[in-house]
Amino acid sequence: MKQLLDFIPLILFFITYKLGGVREAAIVLVVATILQIVILKWKYGIVEKQQKIMASAVVFFGLLTAYFNEIRYLQWKVTIINGLFAIVLLVAQFQFKTPLIKKLLGKELQLPEKAWNTLNLGWALFFIICMLVNIYISHNMSEEAWVDFKSFGIIGMTVIATIISGVYIYRYLPKDGSNSKDGEK
């Protein structure tokens, strides 16, 4: 249910854009995102930091989009958020010597430090690619093409990145069913 809630604002944005236009879609996106946060808080008692950041960005850029009736503000959101995620992952790894992916998944997975570093860099690269593809599409293709990319392309890219991460992690999982503490093969 929690994962489904993440997609509802995006689906409603896409449908409203196709039926109404930019302003209407932005308003629906903002309202649906606020409702999503309220439901998460009510049902689960907590809203994760990443969800708060994303919701704040959606509300801010969505309201700008609705007010000016100009989609470029939502296009900026995608670029800025992906860029920030990449920067945070890279700064955590190189400045603080802590792969952030390990902080997020370290309780569930036991992997060698090299694997955590590779995963962290892989996801930073993914966010950079998403940012660059978003810039390219928003500047060189139609508004409708960008909405399609935002609604489906980024999801597809995320699924592919998740599968690649899963395949990479799998090679470090214990093969005999034991719980190896160091995650070595």
UniProtKB/Swiss-Prot annotation:
Cellular component, GO annotation: plasma membrane
Keyword field: Cell inner membrane, Cell membrane, Membrane, Transmembrane, Transmembrane helix
InterPro entries: YciB
Family the UniProt entry places it in: Belongs to the YciB family.
Protein's cellular compartments: Cell inner membrane
Keyword Zinc attributed: no
PANTHER family in the cross-refs: INNER MEMBRANE-SPANNING PROTEIN YCIB, INTRACELLULAR SEPTATION PROTEIN A-RELATED
Pfam family, one: IspA
Residues spanning the membrane: 27-47, 53-73, 76-96, 118-138, 149-169
Protein name per its UniProtKB record: Inner membrane-spanning protein YciB
Membrane topology according to the record: Multi-pass membrane protein
Cited function: Plays a role in cell envelope biogenesis, maintenance of cell envelope integrity and membrane homeostasis.
